C-alpha cells in the first residue's frame, strides 16, 4: 500500500490526471466531459514531459562537450540522481515524508489563507530525500526524521509558492496557478533584481529588427539560430577523438547542429503541452477547491511559465550559463568547483529570464538570468560542506534546488543551537 502511494505521489502525471478528473466530477460535469477533460489534461502533461525529456537529452551531450571543451572538473548540481541513490538506505523515510508532507500541505491550505497545493511530484520526492539525508545525518531516529521532515516539507510546500506568488502574478497576470518548484524563491528574486535595472517597456518578445531580418521575430527561428551557434562553437573546441565518442562517429558539426535543433523541437513540444495542460487543469482544479480547499491554487512545475515569454527563456538560459561559468572559474576561492549544471541552468535560468522580462523587459531578462546563474552556483559552492554524500557512494554530485538548500541551511543553524555540529 505504501509503495502504491509513493508511486502515485512520485508521478506528477497521475496526480494531475486524478485531480482533473475529481475536479470535473465536483463540478458535476457530464461523463463525456469528465473523460475528455481528464485525458486532455493527461495528454497535455505527458506532451510537456516529452518536450522536457527531449530538451534534457539534447543538453546531456552538450554538457559533456562543454566540460571537455574547457577542461572543467568539479561537482554538478543534480537532485534526482541523489534522491534515487539514497533510496537503498533511506527509502522508508523518504516515502513517509513524501506522503505525510502532502497531507500537511492540504491541511494548511484548508485551514489558512495560503491555498497553495504543491503538485510537482518529482520535486516532492527529491525534497523528501533531502530531508531524510539531512535529518538522519544530524543523529535523529527514523521516526523523528519522518515527523520533522514531513512537517518541514509540508510547510515548505505552502511557504515557497506563497513567497513567489507576487512574481507569478507579474508574469501571468492572475492568481490561477502558483509556482511549485524548489527554485521559485531564487527565480523570483532574480526577476526582481532584473526589474531593478531593466526597462519593462522593451520586452524581449518585441525586439525590433531590420525588415531583412524579420524572420528573427519567430521565436523558434531565433532560438534555433542561437542554439546552433552555441552548440557548434562548443563542439569546435572539443578534440576530434573525444567528439567522436560523444557523437558516435557522426561529424561533430553535423551532430552539434542536430542536437541544437533537437533542443528547439523539445521547447516547441513543451510549449504545446503547457497550453493544452493549463487549458484543462485550471477549471478542473476550481472544482476541487470548491469541495475540499476553497480557493485552492495548484502550484505547478517551472515549464508552465515558458509560454509567456519564449524568447526570454533562451536569453535567461544563456545569461545564467555565463553567470555559472564565472563561479566555475572562481573555484580556487571556494570550497569546491561547481561545474555549470546545464540542465538546471536551463530550467531555472530560462524561468528567471521570463520573470526578469515581466519586470524589466529584455534587459531585465538578461540581468535576471545572469544573477541566477551566478548566485545559484555560489550558493551550491558555499553550502557544499554542510552535507556529505560519500557515505551513500555518491561523488561529483550535490543538491540543485535553491529553496531546499535554504531550508537545509536553516535546519543546520537551528541544530547548532542544540549542540549539533555542522
Predicted features along the sequence, with ranges:
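Signature of multi-pass transmembrane helix bundles
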Residues: 1-51, 96, 100, 104-280, ...
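Membrane helical hairpin/interfacial module
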Residues: 44-95
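Structural signature of hydrophobic alpha-helical transmembrane segments
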Residues: 5-16, 85-99, 334-343
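Mid-membrane cores of alpha-helical transmembrane segments in multi-pass membrane proteins
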Residues: 70-76, 94-102, 121-129, 150-154, ...
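Helix-loop-helix junctions within the multi-pass membrane cores of secondary transporters/permeases
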Residues: 17-19, 35, 59, 63-81, ...
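Juxtamembrane "helix exit" motif at the C-terminal ends of alpha-helical transmembrane segments
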Residues: 226-244, 324-335, 349, 353, ...
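Membrane-helix interface and helix-disruption motif detector
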Residues: 1, 82-90, 116-117, 138-146, ...
